[in-house]
Amino acid sequence: MPTLTTLRKAVLISLYGSAALAAFSPAAMAQSTEAGATDGPVQTVSVVGSRRVASSATDTMVPVDIIPMSRVAEQGGQFDLAQSLQYISPSFNSTRQTGADGADLVDSAALRGLGSDQTLVLVNGKRRHTTALVNLFGARNRGNTGTDMNAIPLLAIKNVQVLRDGAAAQYGSDAIAGVIDIELKKSLGCEAVAGYSQYSAGDGKNYMTSAYCGIALGDKGTLAITGEYLDRGRSNRADADSMRIIGDTKSQNKTLYLNGDYATSGTGKLYFTAGAQTRDASSAAFGRGGIGSDDIPSRNSAAMYPDGFVPFINGKIDDQYATIGHRSQIGEWHADFSQTYGYNKMRYDISHTLNASIANLDLMNGGKGVSASSFDAGGFSFQQLTSNADFSRYYDTVMRGMNVAFGAEYRSEEYKIMAGEPGSYSDVDGVGVGGNGRSQGFPGFQPGDVTKAKRHSIA
């Protein structure tokens, strides 16, 4: 694919810079002045790779990359988190796919070249759910269910911490490749960003607007609100006479995120995070030939697409995430109780297509040989509920410092598959006769595929 225009990076840097200068926060300015007068080195706090509360990056025993969002904006010049980290973190990789039957609608991410379901993603130190999509049909990360990194707006993020080492013993088997912790902002003040980009070939136009505002909840807490709208245009690098479209998918994202905390009695603090995103995306499947090709009548109808056609796999994705918890001090012990909810749903709508068996039956019955050109192909959903109770204490006089931590976790998960409409999966002209059954581009889920499965785990 061609390189991005230099206009993209220049516009992004200037917009992020001007947004930061325009942010109004008297409290933040006062903190900056006070911090500048303080002697001593500034330490960055890391929450991955250690159960110790407020450990610095130099205290951890494992390699942790702490990537501030200011660096991402200046060096990456991207509009979404997955592609931004691709240019910043050496161990992180996210590859946009094409013609992958739904996997190209979600940019799954991974560490160290391992599967996307072997990288654990946290938000403010709490487990984030994976997508409902299982990557199949020859896609990258085949058989994996990754985490949708692009469901979180960039402007809501303070920094990203990447643990570039296996952490299965501490976090579970889904952390074999490493851990990514996304820390959200709670700073006071408001800022806004607008961006535009395109490829040098003139396609793949991207429009992004995002706004952040952090407000004080009296003198006891803060509430941060972030909204983002991202419109990514389709690109195509196939030959002019090709029956394929090879390039970025078309996507429209609408995202809202809340993050904050509120001090309770004593040393306790209530914290909360909530976010929701709706995404309408569209990718191109493999093309079908027209008159004179072997695709008629098996995969096409001369009456509908005499010159051939490219089916489009359209997906509507709903993603929801919420965490509420309470941290306090019980004697010398740090206590943290939390409840996390995650939900991801994806519905397929196949357009610019046909069911060749329906078209062939229509032709056999004296009709023109047509079928419907769009189908509801069904979909799937995934829900996860996680309850945690964590306790830790640091003994600074034992063996030059020793941290003791223990806790419990209960997790409940539910997975569903929904059937599509009959035309998306039926074969009406007889098996092995004439046109192939099912919608071209992506076959719909049948009633026999319908699933509602649950599982529970305690640790």
Walk through the language-model features, giving the residues of each.
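Outer-membrane beta-barrel transmembrane domain signature of Gram-negative proteins
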Residues: 301, 309-322, 341, 353-459
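Residues that define the transmembrane beta-barrel architecture of outer-membrane proteins
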Residues: 174-176, 197, 203-209, 250-254, ...
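Membrane-embedded beta-strand positions of outer-membrane beta-barrel proteins
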Residues: 190-194, 225-227, 272-274, 337-339, ...
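A beta-strand signature from Gram-negative outer-membrane beta-barrel systems
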Residues: 128, 143-193
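N-terminal Sec signal peptide and the immediately downstream disordered periplasmic leader
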Residues: 1-84, 88, 149-152, 210-215, ...
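Transmembrane beta-barrel wall of Gram-negative outer-membrane proteins
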Residues: 191, 201-307, 311-331
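Outer-membrane beta-barrel and related beta-rich outer-membrane complex signature
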Residues: 133-135, 232-241, 271-298, 338-357, ...
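Extracytoplasmic beta-strand/coil segments of soluble accessory domains associated
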Residues: 53, 83-131
